[in-house]
Amino acid sequence: MKDYNIENNNVEEENPNVETQVVDNEEIVRLKAEIEELKDKLIRTTAEIDNTRKRLEKARDEAKDYAIATFAKELLNVSDNLARALAHKPANSDVEVTNIISGVQMTKDELDKIFHKHHIEEIKPAIGSMFDYNLHNAISHIEHPDHEPNSIITLMQSGYKIRDRLLRPAAVQVVKKP
């Protein structure tokens, strides 16, 4: 009988091992699924972080490019006034007036260089070109037999843009249909 008990003891001991192996296999499958889920979350989180970084870099670059926009808008009137002064210079003038005009011209040229350096472009549509509501502001409409409808007949004030952003539209007079 002792032998029989020993065999039973062995059998009883083997059963927990089988259950442990089954439980271990189920646990392995569950853990593998959890690992896959965590890998997926890691990939998604990494992609989200990368996208956030790219958005922040783009926002930083735009902020750098357009930070001077408000200041530039205020300088546009200065540029306009310098251009008006140069447009009305007298034909014949003495040395002092010529020197003043030369100084105004140098100031205007320097301001234009600064505008160019900061990607500020003048919008100066040609007479006869078509009106573009993205770049122009129609101050008035007149009939004119020699020009197409919706074409620009008079430039009243230059416009400006910084890169692709409009600072001020060009003020124009537009031909209307007769």
UniProtKB/Swiss-Prot annotation:
Q: Which GO terms describe its cellular component?
A: cytoplasm
Under the GO molecular function aspect, what terms does this record hold?
adenyl-nucleotide exchange factor activity; protein homodimerization activity; protein-folding chaperone binding; unfolded protein binding
Q: Does the keyword Chaperone apply?
A: yes
Does Chaperone appear among the keywords? yes
What are the disulfide bonds? Answer: none
Main subcellular localisation: cytoplasm
- GO BP term (any one): protein import into mitochondrial matrix
Recorded hits in InterPro entries, A to Z, give:
GrpE (IPR000740), GrpE_coiled_coil (IPR013805), GrpE_head (IPR009012)
Recorded family membership? Belongs to the GrpE family.
Subunit annotation = Homodimer.
Its function, per the record, reads:
Participates actively in the response to hyperosmotic and heat shock by preventing the aggregation of stress-denatured proteins, in association with DnaK and GrpE. It is the nucleotide exchange factor for DnaK and may function as a thermosensor. Unfolded proteins bind initially to DnaJ; upon interaction with the DnaJ-bound protein, DnaK hydrolyzes its bound ATP, resulting in the formation of a stable complex. GrpE releases ADP from DnaK; ATP binding to DnaK triggers the release of the substrate protein, thus completing the reaction cycle.
Official protein name in the record = Protein GrpE
What gene makes this protein? Answer: grpE
